[in-house]
Regions:
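C-terminal substrate/ligand-recognition segments
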Residues: 107-127
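Alpha-helical positions within canonical tetratricopeptide repeat
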Residues: 20-24, 28, 76, 129
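Inter-helical turn/loop segments and adjacent helix faces that build the functional surface
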Residues: 8-26
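Alpha-solenoid helical repeat scaffolds
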Residues: 12-15, 127, 140, 181
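Extended glycan-interaction surfaces of carbohydrate-active proteins
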Residues: 30-111, 132-189
Length: 189
C-alpha cells in the first residue's frame, strides 16, 4: 500500500499540473515497487506470497495488476494465479489464505477473494472461466441481493459480517469489468 499511495500521489500531482511533485512521488514510488516485487516473490513457491520471505499464499496478491505493481501477463503473476488455484480454491470459493492464524486454520472463504480471482482470470484472457465463476457467485446472494463477508465452501452458508460492503463492492467492480462499456454497447456500430 505504500507503493500505491505514492503512485497515486504522483498521478494526482500530474493531473493538477505539478510536474515537480509528480516526479518526486514517482521517484519515491519506484524503489518501493521494486522492493515489493523482489521481496514478495518466492522463487521456491513460484508465486508472490503473503509477506516478504514468507512461504504462505494470500489471495490479496491477486490485486497486484489492478494496483499497477505488475502486468497481469507477467510470468510471475501467471504462476501466482496457478498457485492460488491449486492451494486456495475450494469448490469455486477462494480462501484468503490457508495458513493458521489467531483463530486456527481458516474454515470459510472470504467472498471478495472470489472476485479478485475472477478479475485475474479476466485480465489473463480466461474470459469464459471468469464469467462462469462470477455468475456462480451470484447464486449465493440472499433474497435482497446481498452477500456476507465469508462463505462456507462446503455448504455455501453465508458467514461473518452481513451485509459486507467489501463483498458487495467486489461484486459491483467485477460486474463492471466483465460488462461491455456503455460506449461500445450504445454508441458504436
Amino acid at each position: 500500500m505504500c507503493w500505491a499511495g505514492c503512485h497515486r500521489l504522483a498521478a494526482i500531482a500530474e493531473r493538477l499540473g505539478l510536474p515537480d511533485r509528480a516526479a518526486h512521488w514517482n521517484a519515491v514510488a519506484e524503489p518501493v515497487r521494486q522492493a515489493l516485487i523482489q521481496g514478495a516473490w518466492n522463487e521456491k513457491r513460484q508465486a508472490f506470497t503473503a509477506a516478504f520471505g514468507s512461504d504462505d499464499l494470500d489471495a490479496s496478491v491477486l490485486l497486484l495488476p489492478d494496483l499497477g505493481v505488475i502486468e497481469a501477463d507477467d510470468a510471475r503473476f501467471v504462476s501466482t494465479v496457478k498457485a492460488m488455484e491449486r492451494e486456495l480454491l475450494r469448490e469455486k470459493h477462494v480462501m484468503r489464505y490457508a495458513a493458521a492464524d489467531d483463530f486456527g486454520l481458516p474454515a470459510t472463504a472470504f467472498l471478495i477473494c472470489r472476485f479478485w480471482l475472477v478479475d485475474a482470470w479476466w485480465s489473463l484472457g480466461r474470459r469464459d472461466e471468469a464469467r462462469e465463476l462470477f455468475v456462480d457467485a451470484l447464486a449465493y446472494r440472499n433474497r435482497y441481493g446481498l452477500l456476507s463477508e465469508d462463505i462456507d465452501p462446503q455448504t455455501g452458508t453465508l458467514w461473518g459480517n452481513f451485509p459486507q460492503t467489501y463483498s458487495m463492492a467486489g461484486l459491483i467492480l467485477t460486474a463492471m469489468r466483465l460488462s461491455r462499456s456503455w460506449e461500445d454497447r450504445y454508441w458504436r456500430g
